[in-house]
Amino acid sequence: MAHSESAAFEKAAKALDTFQIEIPSWGFANTGTRFGKFVQAAAASTIEEKFSDASEVHHLTGSTPTMALHVLWDLPNGVADIPAVHDLERKYGVRSGAINPNLFQDQEYKFGSLCNPSAEIRKHAMRCV
């Protein structure tokens, strides 16, 4: 390997040592599409199981210190769930990251959320983000 290639490789390797990825909580649950769900025996079904799985991924990779949450799927009681989430963060050593609102599932979002033709729906979506 030529010196410049070696230096480029070392630079890339060093950058990867500090690279971090936020993993989505829903990546540990059953998955699917609008056409159906793909059920997996080991899929996480609670937020604690998701934190446990995220902790294992972070332990193996060292590059996933945060997990994005979904407001309806992970925080069904809204802000009342936050103390329990903080406990899970401490227990599993993974922090919460982005809190994603549900701006896609309901019928009102058939034509989008922030770009919906309805001013009322766009306004509601803006309040959620």
Residue spans for each PLM region:
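N-terminal pre-domain/capping segments
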Residues: M1-C128
